[in-house]
Amino acid sequence: MDLVLSSQTDLTNYVKKVSIEDFGCQFLHTAHWNNRLRTTGGRFFPNDRHLDFNPKIYREFGIDIFRKIVRHELCHYHLYIQGKGYQHRDKAFKELLEKVDGLRYTPRVTAVKVNYHHYSCQSCGQVYRRRRRVNLRKFACGYCHGRLIESF
């Protein structure tokens, strides 16, 4: 049976469950999915004590790896609540992370291919590559002020 964490409520309930099972302490705040995370599995915010998680990690690696990332973020959370060193460099963090079998580093997510639009100047042949489309009636070549055409 594969666990499906589709909503913020499901995610928060899962984090609360992991906190009780692996730490013996309650998680009293909220957990959120954050699609903007690229190179990290999760983040802990000391100001309001909420956790953000990367949904790509959950989708790509499954619940086992994701649970280890949840443990990692809960190490930050519980140590901060207890007033101990909660940063990666702190001894208390390293010891607790090893004790609960959390991940020290997030596995790499396969990069999403970015599509580019290619344009070239009719006069001088200068080639431009842009992520966003360019209005060809409004913009001209930056070198010779010639007309741009879309090339493939």
From Swiss-Prot:
InterPro entries: SprT-like_domain, Uncharacterised_SprT-like
GO cellular component term of the entry, any: cytoplasm
Active site: E73
Record bears the keyword Plastid: no
Entry binding sites for Zn(2+): H72, H76
Names of required cofactors: Zn(2+)
Span of domain SprT-like: 13-148
UniProt keyword Zinc, yes or no: yes
Subcellular location: Cytoplasm
GO biological process, one term: response to stress
GO molecular function, one term: zinc ion binding
UniProt entry keywords in alphabetical sequence: Cytoplasm, Metal-binding, Zinc
Cofactor, free-text remark: Binds 1 zinc ion.
Family of the protein in this entry: Belongs to the SprT family.
Protein name per UniProt: Protein SprT-like
